[in-house]
């Protein structure tokens, strides 16, 4: 069998390597993710609970589930999943992120298997998971379809993938690039490339081509007056998230 070619974009990896030490600083370069994280977690936990019939009010509701956090960064999603009882593997192509993630997990008393690897390498090795968290990654890869095919292969039959990214339209450029990188300086300039953003319809089509069954999509909407994020059923104009299952 021919080895799968990695979809990792070296220039994208270099951007995150340069910021690695700041992952757990809520006022640092990853401030946007810290602000967004409660919404991401609300969506992720509700989707997993619904798909696997888990009661979030119980202790360790995700016990027995194997979860992959691909593009895990410093572990902002891996750690909450571990606290909910899941067996968590955090994978990242940016090796500099992982010492930060490992140290923070150890300090937090959590056991998380952090690996410097790619989705393609894990799929080729035959790794299988109940859930794949694919959050804010697809807009940074060189070939989205090949990448999503690899993440599909990592899912067990009946598994669930949560995938979030950024829409491509004038509003997303104004907010995610000009607003976040130029005006607010939440992120270094060049963190995102507008041409790599993906519309919800494009992402649904890619997920289907990759062998997944898209079942839900929601928007993450920032309110500059309340200075907080919320989940929207209708507004997918900038940040949005999807849920897909594997038959």
Curated annotation (Swiss-Prot):
Enzyme class (EC, first level): transferase
Classification via CDD domains: AdoMet_MTases
Domain of life: Bacteria
Gene3D superfamilies: Vaccinia Virus protein VP39 (3.40.50.150)
GO molecular function, one term: 3-demethylubiquinol 3-O-methyltransferase activity
Keyword DNA damage attributed: no
Keywords attached to this entry: Methyltransferase, S-adenosyl-L-methionine, Transferase, Ubiquinone biosynthesis
GO biological process annotation, one example: methylation
Disulfide bonds: none
Keyword S-adenosyl-L-methionine: yes
The protein's annotated pathway: Cofactor biosynthesis; ubiquinone biosynthesis
EC number annotated for this UniProt entry: 2.1.1.222, 2.1.1.64
Binding site for S-adenosyl-L-methionine: 40, 71, 92, 135
Reactions this protein catalyses: a 3-demethylubiquinol + S-adenosyl-L-methionine = a ubiquinol + S-adenosyl-L-homocysteine + H(+); a 3-(all-trans-polyprenyl)benzene-1,2-diol + S-adenosyl-L-methionine = a 2-methoxy-6-(all-trans-polyprenyl)phenol + S-adenosyl-L-homocysteine + H(+)
Family classification: Belongs to the methyltransferase superfamily. UbiG/COQ3 family.
Reported function: O-methyltransferase that catalyzes the 2 O-methylation steps in the ubiquinone biosynthetic pathway.
Protein name in the entry: Ubiquinone biosynthesis O-methyltransferase
Organism listed in the record: Ruegeria sp. (strain TM1040) (Silicibacter sp.)
Encoding gene, per UniProt annotation: ubiG
């Amino acid at each position: 069998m021919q080895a799968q070619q990695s979809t990792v974009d070296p220039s994208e990896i270099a951007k995150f390597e340069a910021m690695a030490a700041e992952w757990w600083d809520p006022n640092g370069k990853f401030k946007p993710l810290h602000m967004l994280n409660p919404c991401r977690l609300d969506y992720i936990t509700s989707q997993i609970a619904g798909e696997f019939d888990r009661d979030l009010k119980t202790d360790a509701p995700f016990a027995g589930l194997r979860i992959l956090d691909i593009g895990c960064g410093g572990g902002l999603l891996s750690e909450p999943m571990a606290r909910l009882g899941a067996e968590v593997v955090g994978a990242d192509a940016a090796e500099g992120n992982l010492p930060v993630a490992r140290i923070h997990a150890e300090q937090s008393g959590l056991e998380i298997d952090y690996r410097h690897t790619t989705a393609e390498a894990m799929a080729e090795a035959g790794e299988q998971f109940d859930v794949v968290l694919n959050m804010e990654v697809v807009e940074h890869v060189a070939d989205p379809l090949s990448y999503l095919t690899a993440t599909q292969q990592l899912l067990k039959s009946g598994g669930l993938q949560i995938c979030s990214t950024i829409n491509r339209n004038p509003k997303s450029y104004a907010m995610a690039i000009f607003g976040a990188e130029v005006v607010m300086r939440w992120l270094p300039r060049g963190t995102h490339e507008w041409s790599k953003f993906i519309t919800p319809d494009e992402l649904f089509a890619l997920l289907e081509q990759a062998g997944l069954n898209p079942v839900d999509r929601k928007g993450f909407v920032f309110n500059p007056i309340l200075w907080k994020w919320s989940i929207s059923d209708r507004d997918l104009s900038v940040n949005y998230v999807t849920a897909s299952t594997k038959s």
